[in-house]
Amino acid sequence: KARFTEFGQRYRFDDALLSKHPGKKFQELVPVHDYNKIYEEWWKKTLDGVADVAWPGKIKYYALSSGTSDAASKYIPVTKELLRSNAVNYLRQILSLIRYDEANKKAMTKGFLFLGGATDLKKGKAGWYAGDLSGILAKKRPFWFQTFYKPGGRIAAMSDWNQKLNEIVEHAKDWDIGHIVGVPAW
């Protein structure tokens, strides 16, 4: 999918795709990048709104990850395809509950308490948004999941973790929760 991007053109993705052994050819053509290298050479451009750099189109969301490298926050692109894939996985996980005993089938009609980062994302100058990956995924949850979703928009937007937990504790007695879910840390 990225063959027509700057990255795909530079590293000759077409050659890899046409190769008898595409995976091996890809490894030969594309050097390993650490975060600083890929950010400086590629991803930094996308923060300025440049499209088709390392993935087709413009990047609208960035997951922020603090790390051990030079940057205080690492900006990691979150593509539309990743968000779509996440929506499909929501559905798969819910449908997988059907295979289990009667208690789990009843739980399918109950709420999902999603514990994660704030959905109140930081807006960048080129129109993109950045925040915790879990906050992005919660904000971009599928429309059909809204009915089951707790803690709700107001509480989910809170960036102060202690305040968020206090609000959840205060309101949880009124929710019919069958599942507690979250996004694993990096």
Residue ranges and their predicted role:
Residues 1-64, 70-185:
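Nucleotide 5′-phosphate-binding alpha/beta core
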